[in-house]
């Protein structure tokens, strides 16, 4: 049931993002995960341009995408958008928890194709510890990720990521 629910939620999120009536379309990429797990969770990549503008208008200081994505006000913004989507979903098929990822999904990292189609198996494998931490109810996770730079070199990035509940999730 969660696999079907995951796909329904993914479609509803895409529809909500396409709805330009929203004051801020804050997500540029998201993946809803739930197959084989107790709840639906979301890994969100914030839209740097839209959220950056929102942050500037609301006095939220940041120096990088990673810093912006982890600001409490941005978690509130994303949580509110997820709660709005949840309000239109059947009981039990709402996103219960989410994380704002410290980076955007990137073709160079193998997470999406060049046409921006998500590679779920790669995301599930790479971000498995985050997904498990969300399902375990943790409030944050120390996450180490390998990254690929535009010049092809690789490096390691350590981040503390906040894990958050979506208000009103059933």
Predicted features, each with a name:
Residues 1-170:
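AMP-binding adenylation
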């Amino acid at each position: 049931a969660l696999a079907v629910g995951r796909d329904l939620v993914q479609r509803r999120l895409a529809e909500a993002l396409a709805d330009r009536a929203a004051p801020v379309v804050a997500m540029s990429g998201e993946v809803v995960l739930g197959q084989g797990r107790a709840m639906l969770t979301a890994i969100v990549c914030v839209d740097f341009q839209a959220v950056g503008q929102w942050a500037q208008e609301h006095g939220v200081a940041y120096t990088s995408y990673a810093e912006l994505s982890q600001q409490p006000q941005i978690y509130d913004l994303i949580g509110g958008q997820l709660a709005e989507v949840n309000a239109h979903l059947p009981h039990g098929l709402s996103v219960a928890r989410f994380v704002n990822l410290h980076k955007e999904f990137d073709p160079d990292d193998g997470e999406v194709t060049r046409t921006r189609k998500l590679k779920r198996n790669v995301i599930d494998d790479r971000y498995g510890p985050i997904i498990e931490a969300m399902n375990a109810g943790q409030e944050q996770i120390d996450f180490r990720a390998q990254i690929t730079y535009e010049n092809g070199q690789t490096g390691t990035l350590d981040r503390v990521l906040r894990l958050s509940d979506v208000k009103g999730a059933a």
